[in-house]
Amino acid sequence: MRQITIRLADPSDAAALCDMHQDFMSYANTLQMPYTSRKFWEHRMSQGDQSATRLVAVIDAVVVGLLGINQNSNPRRRHVVNFGITVNKSYRGQGVGSALMQAMIDYCDNWLGIRRIELEVFANNPDGLALYEKFGFQREGIARDYAFRDGRYVDAILMSRINDQPK
């Protein structure tokens, strides 16, 4: 198995992220719109959003995955983050998602003092559900008609992981 390096994303990753999001499953299982341009990703990666942290997975100098962590700005919910993840189609099933998840959990638990990590996953994404459950996320409910995708409304499953031992 090749070594997976996790690091903070930077503006030079825009082209790789644009390419990764051209695959149907990369935008079908996220809230990204299809056909995003390189300019869109350059803008997104260069803006200094203080509430977002983006981690990338790299194999052999190629960006193969992205995980975005979004901290809640409401003072009463600063203990909460939400995240989204995408893995390049050529690298799925090779531990990239797990490496990104482990890095995110370590970052949230040991550096940010986050108590609750939450996410929404489309109900018809069994690979995503399995990955999140592998890392201790529990199902909390269903958001009916959560998003419009490929001509129809789809449900999402709400999940979270509670850190009972914040530092």
Regions found by a protein language model. Name each.
Residues 4-19:
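A short beta-loop-alpha structural element at the N-terminal edge
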Residues 152-167:
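Terminal substrate-recognition subdomain of acyl/acetyltransferases
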Residues 8-11, 24-90, 101-102, 107, ...:
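Acetyl-CoA-dependent GNAT
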Residues 94, 98, 110, 123-141:
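Conserved active-site alpha-helix within GNAT-family acetyltransferase domains
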Residues 92, 119-129, 146-150:
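Conserved beta-strand-loop-alpha-helix junction that forms the acyl-donor binding cleft
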Residues 109-120:
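Conserved GNAT acetyl-CoA-binding A-motif
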